[in-house]
A protein has these predicted regions:
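Extended beta-strand/beta-hairpin segments
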Residues: 1-155
Length: 155
């Protein structure tokens, strides 16, 4: 079951011509870029490690991490936990194949120095219920959320 939005807060709009290789998404003069292809994805050839332009997976990871970081802040505030100023989120989105079908999967590393591991883990998991990107992919892709060393004892 899908949930309909009652009030639209923001609309991100792009117009794409061609494919990743041939075209580029552009929107309202704030986003105008050329995307790189993920190498020769149709063959079993190693992908280029460094691309001249961002890949769609990087853009998705960037948008998701910004949203998820905000969700962490909302959840922490509700739980009366002060997040450290050096808290960080790293999201990696993989494009891959199983048989002839293409899929994405993601890894999220959350760092909350000074926050007890169990508290950080509870905040990180609850943030998935708040973040629209996490909700969009829930049950659709494999997502591993990891709490990276917090340097604090259990609460």
């Amino acid at each position: 079951m899908t949930t309909k939005i009652q009030t639209v807060l923001l609309t991100g709009k792009t117009h794409t011509t061609g494919s990743r290789r041939e075209g580029a998404p552009h929107g309202d003069d704030r986003l105008d870029l050329q995307l790189s292809t993920p190498g020769n994805a149709g063959n079993d050839i190693a992908f280029t490690a460094i691309q001249a332009h961002p890949a769609a997976e990087q853009l998705f990871a960037g948008a998701w991490s910004a949203c998820y970081t905000g969700a962490l802040g909302l959840v922490a505030k509700a739980k009366k936990v002060t997040l450290p100023s050096d808290m960080s989120v790293d999201i990696e989105v993989d494009l891959g194949k199983t048989g002839s079908a293409y899929f994405i999967q993601a890894r999220i590393d959350v760092r909350m120095p000074g926050v007890a591991h169990d508290v950080a883990e509870a905040i990180a998991q609850a943030a998935h219920d708040v973040c629209p990107y996490s909700k969009a992919v829930h049950g659709n892709i494999d997502v591993a959320t990891n709490i990276v060393a917090t340097d604090a004892v259990a609460a």
